Amino acid sequence: MTERERKFEEMLNDILTQYAEVSEKMELLKAEGKNKTVAFKQLLASKLTLQNILIMYKNHGLIDSF
């Protein structure tokens, strides 16, 4: 594996981890009825950004799914 490939894999793992963490935090806020708070909306924006990155990876054949 080249250095570039290793860095890509690290970045992909970071994005997947962040996506899972943001999703979990959103679920907790939603369960508490706090889905209209600024914190929830900020998490939603982060989740959508991460999701768009993952979709680009998928569209270019770099990952199968997330």
List the model feature ranges, each with a label.
Residues M1-F66:
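Extended, charge-rich alpha-helical interface modules
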